[in-house]
């Protein structure tokens, strides 16, 4: 703890005996708060994304109670407040559309209220980046408490994974391998408790990223949602955030360039979601840390994927916790000289390496040795070329090795509705060597960059035993999904990107090793085609231009995938200077 305590923001509400202090205290006292609670102790916000519409976060009211116990025990004053809960499971057209809106909610709630530090209760995919983005814009002391994954999914005595099983079973249904009854019987078995997806999807990936970044306590990522140790971690986080408030340990001291480099390496080791590329860029943008797509190649390249979890591997998240969780992975990386910045500071005041140097590994089938990885080179690939001049991403650990270098004929879907209307057509001119191309599903074009990039294959090819094809889009893909899928093509079609120029029958070349994605037409032909494209005609854009509202604001200001899909006016740190009095 520093020798001089920082001045707490909350004293500018409750620390005076004038009219303003009287009013602020009086209003709070209608909740039964006694005088001694206003003695200058740190006021700790608990930013809660609980909602019955976000089943991943359905247990957060109980989680918040355990955080409060820790805060009170440490001498703090807990105040819980709600923010927009942008859950992936129900929210249309995409939770990505409202990630930035949720971050604005968080930022303004922190800055405008008597909050000295904040605990971020995050669970479903976009809640973690949204909360971190908002808190980073204020640069206050903050700690992430993730909700944790669901219990293992079960079907007919076997483990099944959230999301992953949906894609697998639906493909089997379309191929005629199972009937509808068998397909629907998996619903309850896949989701057996509160919590996030029990695979290494985006929610678990971002929980791991929070831990690797140092903004969460060790083991935050993997403890199952309904395990009592999840509530112990919440309690201990409540204790620690009070200490952080008194120490002045703000996010900018933790979310450094070194921390982001550690997170990129960790993402490769766990086989994490491609969505982390967008979210880490957005968080870095809010805290003022430069982070580029090339960093993913430089740091992630040649990193073995050593965690054998669905969708890349065999096991669900519950087994990951029992094996040792992320600390065991980080220790293994560190001992192999693969942890870029072991001295990076974390929320408990220790270095990342100090937190993990003694971490045990209880199951080397789940967390493998470096010399026996699941994938020898598992880092997310960044692709560039005339089809993606500002980049695209591909996840090798979820792809088919034989398709990572491929040349095929394009089968083009102008938008998601076009895909849905034609994919089941037995007359569709497509074969296993074709490259499926989906346009107008990016940040502006959808809008909100939905998770539709892992297009299901045509039933006629599934019946032939085809399991994977090269797919290219400006969309995203669920972290629970798999396949040789090129995502986040930038610029997107609805921003006038080259993807808009692709036509049926064009030849496309993918070379993952070389990092290239090439449309085999001349530059002159590409320019000629693009001159005929009207980006405002994309269905997602055209459908919103006359309506106004948040979606219109988003379309007008959203950045491209390589820039993190933040709104242009939100990038940067605005601090937590106390605003003027409200009366």
UniProtKB/Swiss-Prot annotation:
Catalyses:
L-arabinonate = 2-dehydro-3-deoxy-L-arabinonate + H2O
The record's section on SUPFAM superfamilies has: IlvD/EDD N-terminal domain-like (SSF143975), LeuD/IlvD-like (SSF52016)
Give residues annotated as binding [4Fe-4S] cluster. 56, 124, 197
> Which branch of life, at top level?
Bacteria
Q: Where is the signal peptide?
A: none
Q: What is its EC number?
A: 4.2.1.25
- Give the InterPro entries listed for this entry: Dihydro-acid_dehy_C, DiOHA_6PGluconate_deHydtase_CS, ILV_EDD_C, ILV_EDD_N, IlvD/EDD_N, Sugar_Degrad_Dehydratases
Record keywords: 4Fe-4S, Arabinose catabolism, Carbohydrate metabolism, Iron, Iron-sulfur, Lyase, Metal-binding
Q: What one GO molecular function would you report for this record?
A: 4 iron, 4 sulfur cluster binding
What's the reported outcome of changing residue 56 to A?
Loss of activity but seems to be able to bind a Fe-S cluster
Intrachain S-S bonds? none
Q: Which cofactor does it need?
A: [4Fe-4S] cluster
> Which is a GO BP term held by this UniProt record?
L-arabinose catabolic process to 2-oxoglutarate
Listed result of changing residue 197 to A:
Loss of activity and no 4Fe-4S cluster binding
Q: How does it assemble?
A: Homodimer.
> What the protein does?
Catalyzes the dehydration of L-arabonate to L-2-keto-3-deoxyarabonate (L-KDA). Is involved in a degradation pathway of L-arabinose that allows A.brasilense to grow on L-arabinose as a sole carbon source. To a lesser extent, can also use D-xylonate as substrate, but not D-galactonate, D-arabonate, and D-gluconate.
* The family this protein is said to belong to: Belongs to the IlvD/Edd family.
Name of the molecule in the record: L-arabonate dehydratase
- Organism of origin: Azospirillum brasilense
Q: What is the lineage of its organism?
A: Bacteria, Pseudomonadati, Pseudomonadota, Alphaproteobacteria, Rhodospirillales
Question: What would be the name of the gene that encodes this protein?
Answer: araC
């Amino acid at each position: 703890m520093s020798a001089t305590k920082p001045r707490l923001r909350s004293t500018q509400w409750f620390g005076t005996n004038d009219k303003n202090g009287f009013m602020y205290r009086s209003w709070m006292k209608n909740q039964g708060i006694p005088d001694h609670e206003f003695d200058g102790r740190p006021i700790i916000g608990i930013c809660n994304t609980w909602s019955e519409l976000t089943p991943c976060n359905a247990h957060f009211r109980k989680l918040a109670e355990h955080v409060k116990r820790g805060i009170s025990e440490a001498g703090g004053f807990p105040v819980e407040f709600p923010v927009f809960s942008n859950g992936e499971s129900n929210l249309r057209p995409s939770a990505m559309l409202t990630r930035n809106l949720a971050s604005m909610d968080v930022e303004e709630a922190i800055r405008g209220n008597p909050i000295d530090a904040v605990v971020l209760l995050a669970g479903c995919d976009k809640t973690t980046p949204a909360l971190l983005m908002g808190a980073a814009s204020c640069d206050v002391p903050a700690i992430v408490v993730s909700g944790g994954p669901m219990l293992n999914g079960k079907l007919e005595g076997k483990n099944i994974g959230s999301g992953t099983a949906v894609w697998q079973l639906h493909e089997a249904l379309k191929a005629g391998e199972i009937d509808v009854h068998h397909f629907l019987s998996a619903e309850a078995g896949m989701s057996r408790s509160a919590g996030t997806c029990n695979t290494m999807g985006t929610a678990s990936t971002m929980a791991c990223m929070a831990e690797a970044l140092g903004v969460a306590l060790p083991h935050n990522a993997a403890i199952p949602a309904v395990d009592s140790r999840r509530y112990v971690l919440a309690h201990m986080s409540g204790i620690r955030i009070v200490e952080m408030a008194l120490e002045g340990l703000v996010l900018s001291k933790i979310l450094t360039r070194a921390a982001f480099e550690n997170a990129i390496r960790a993402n490769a080791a766990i086989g994490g979601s491609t969505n982390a590329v967008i979210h880490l860029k957005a968080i870095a943008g809010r805290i003022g840390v430069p982070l580029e797509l090339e960093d993913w190649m430089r740091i992630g390249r040649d990193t073995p994927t050593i965690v054998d979890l669905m969708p890349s591997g065999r096991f669900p998240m519950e087994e990951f916790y029992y094996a040792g969780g992320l600390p065991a992975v980080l220790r293994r990386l560190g001992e192999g000289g693969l942890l870029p910045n072991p001295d990076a500071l974390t929320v408990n005041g220790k270095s990342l390496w100090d937190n993990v140097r003694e971490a045990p590994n209880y199951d080397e089938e789940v967390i493998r040795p470096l010399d026996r990885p699941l994938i020898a080179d598992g880092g997310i690939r960044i692709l560039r070329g005339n089809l993606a001049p500002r980049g695209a991403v591909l996840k090798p650990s979820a792809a088919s090795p034989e398709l990572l270098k491929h040349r095929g004929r394009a089968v083009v879907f102008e938008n998601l509705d076009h895909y849905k209307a034609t994919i089941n057509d037995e007359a569709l001119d497509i074969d296993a060597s074709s490259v499926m191309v989906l346009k107008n599903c990016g940040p502006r074009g959808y809008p909100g960059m939905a998770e539709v990039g892992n297009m299901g294959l045509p039933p006629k090819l599934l019946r032939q035993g085809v399991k994977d094809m090269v797919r290219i889009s400006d969309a995203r893909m669920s972290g629970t999904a798999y396949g040789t899928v090129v995502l986040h093509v930038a610029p997107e079609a609805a921003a006038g990107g080259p993807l808009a120029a692709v036509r049926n029958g064009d030849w496309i070349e993918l070379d993952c090793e070389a990092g290239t994605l090439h449309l085999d037409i001349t530059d002159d032909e590409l320019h000629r085609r693009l001159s005929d494209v009207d980006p405002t005609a994309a269905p997602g854009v055209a459908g919103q231009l006359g309506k106004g509202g948040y979606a219109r604001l988003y379309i007008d200001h959203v950045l491209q995938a390589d820039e993190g899909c933040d709104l242009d006016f939100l990038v940067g740190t605005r601090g937590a200077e106390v605003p003027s009095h409200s009366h």
